C-alpha cells in the first residue's frame, strides 16, 4: 500500500464521499456514497473503503 492509498483510506473513514470522489471522480459511485452517508454513515464508510481499496 502506498502513502496515497493510506491517506485515501483515512479520508474514507472520516469523509466517505470525498474519498470516493478522489478515487473515481464525480459519478454514480460518488452519488451513491453521498446518499449512503447522509442516511446511514456506517454503510457509506464501508462503501467508500471498498471503492478506495479496489481502485
UniProtKB/Swiss-Prot annotation:
Keyword Lyase: no
Transmembrane feature ranges: 6-26, 34-54
Database matches in Pfam families: Pmp3 (PF01679)
Location(s) in or outside the cell: Cell membrane
GO cellular component: plasma membrane
Source organism superkingdom: Eukaryota
Protein function: Plays a role in the regulation of membrane potential. Could mediate a proton leak.
Source organism of this protein record: Eremothecium gossypii (strain ATCC 10895 / CBS 109.51 / FGSC 9923 / NRRL Y-1056)
Alphabetic keyword roster: Cell membrane, Membrane, Transmembrane, Transmembrane helix
A single GO BP: regulation of membrane potential
Similarity field: Belongs to the UPF0057 (PMP3) family.
Bilayer topology annotation: Multi-pass membrane protein
GO molecular function list: phosphatidic acid binding; phosphatidylinositol-3,5-bisphosphate binding; phosphatidylinositol-3-phosphate binding; sphingolipid binding
Name of the featured protein: Plasma membrane proteolipid 3
